[in-house]
Amino acid sequence: MVRARRTKRASVTDIYRGCKASNTCPPDVINKVEQSTIADKILKYGSAAVFFGGLGISTGRGTGGATGYVPLGQGPGVRVGGAPTVVRPGVIPEVIGPTELIPIDSVTPIDPTAPSIVSLTDSSAVDLLPGEVETIAEVHPGPIDPIEIDTPVVSGGRNTNAILEVADPHPPTRATVSRTQYNNPAFQIISEVIPTSGESSLADHVLVSEGSGGQQIGGTRTAEEIELQPLLSRYSFEIEEPTPPRRTSTPLQRARQQFSSLRRALYNRRLTEQVGVTDPLFFTSPSKLVRFQFDNPVFDEQVTQIFEQDIADFEEPPDRQFLDVVKLGRPTLTESAEGYVRVSRLGRRGTIRTRSGTQIGSQVHFYRDLSTINTEEPLEMQLLGEHSGDASIVQGPVESTLVDVNVTEVPEGVLTETSMDPDTFNSEDLLLDDAIEDFSGSQLVVGTPRRSTTSITVPRFQTPQNPTIYYQDIQGYHVSYPESRERPAIIYPTPDIPTVVIHVADSSGDFYLHPSLRWRRRKRKYL
């Protein structure tokens, strides 16, 4: 039996606040809040006559009052918990008196040869502030290279004319030619560098010569022959595939623990029902499998969904597998035992509902597997392009064809071939194209190159067409079959004696009972 919940009662202060305005408070509430009970009055009147201050009564400090605890037959009391007295050494105070008197010298007359600037500072005054600290820093600058500045040179004397050397306003510019090469392992190019003016080093060709001279020190000995091994190109590289292939990017221990706990919750057959879903709506709109509803583009289906249903209303779900589902969790991607990618949702059914409103149901694991992703073989990278040199020279006059035509003169045979009048002939008429385009049997393509094209085939008709006239035969045809079948006639049983006889010709609509159905009078036998 469930115990009733205990309701918290209102305090005396809350009752006093609510009933004081309407003057409906009980007397005990007023006495307790306003401290007008008998005990309060005794304390008020007794405290006016008797003073117990300093004794520490009902304070809970445990100090024994102002005099402390005094044992019987002993000296004065001792305070409990008092702070110890700190003994400080005595310091001789300094005598504060007037400052020393400085005598004032008599006024000395100013010498006529003395300077007119008089210093206002008195060197005999007492400086109360601390003395200034003089800081001396020696700076030794480094050697500075002389900078050559082109300035005009002026040479001459008193009796010679001035000669000015004027600098060139447009000095020659100094050009620096450099070359930078970046190595890209995904792109290999075979180039022949054409040296330009001003470049003295090329990094593509290195010449090594042996036996070109030198001086030999010591005796003659056989040189050691070292077999050279072919070195790989600097542009080639290999990617090692892990064995076995990795399935996760960051295999952390924490992620494995979460995956194991989730797997126990989904695949526990004793506590969770396993239901495989075949409808593809389970990926995008799983709520449509639970109940009929309209599409809401704002609603996100990738969350936990709760379906509420009244007891009196019962709706058949679109899919019988989602019957009585009241909660459907968010999607979870896992891996099945066969290696497929599985989309799982953990739901709960509301099969039983108690009188208090509690729903009881089992947990259901809805899942659907995706197709496998096969491992493709790696593709070998090919060279993007090769050329024989850095620069391409195109000579227009050599590769183009020039035709010199005099438009003022009519070529021979043109008027004959084109059947033109020599009086109205114009040289621009030769540029006209008289070709006739024939689009019969062609195909019309509608669309842009970036989008999918739609092909429309235009049929080709022959002209003129002979009309086709269809005549319908009115007489028809008679088809005789070689075999005949007899269908049995069904005879429905009819009663011999009618129950009710209705006269149709009679306008009254009355009926007569058959004489055989009338009650027969029983004749009694008299003894």
Curated annotation (Swiss-Prot):
Q: Which UniProt keywords apply?
A: Capsid protein, Cytoplasmic inwards viral transport, Disulfide bond, DNA-binding, Host endosome, Host Golgi apparatus, Host nucleus, Host-virus interaction, Late protein, Microtubular inwards viral transport, Phosphoprotein, Viral penetration into host nucleus, Virion, Virus entry into host cell
PTM summary from the entry reads: Highly phosphorylated.
Residue numbers of motif Nuclear localization signal?
A: 1-10, 519-526
Instruction: Please name the GO terms of the biological process aspect recorded for this protein, alphabetically.
Output: microtubule-dependent intracellular transport of viral material towards nucleus; symbiont entry into host cell; viral penetration into host nucleus
Q: Which family does it belong to?
A: Belongs to the papillomaviridae L2 protein family.
What function is annotated for this protein? Answer: Minor protein of the capsid that localizes along the inner surface of the virion, within the central cavities beneath the L1 pentamers. Plays a role in capsid stabilization through interaction with the major capsid protein L1. Once the virion enters the host cell, L2 escorts the genomic DNA into the nucleus by promoting escape from the endosomal compartments and traffic through the host Golgi network.
Please give the name of this protein.
Minor capsid protein L2
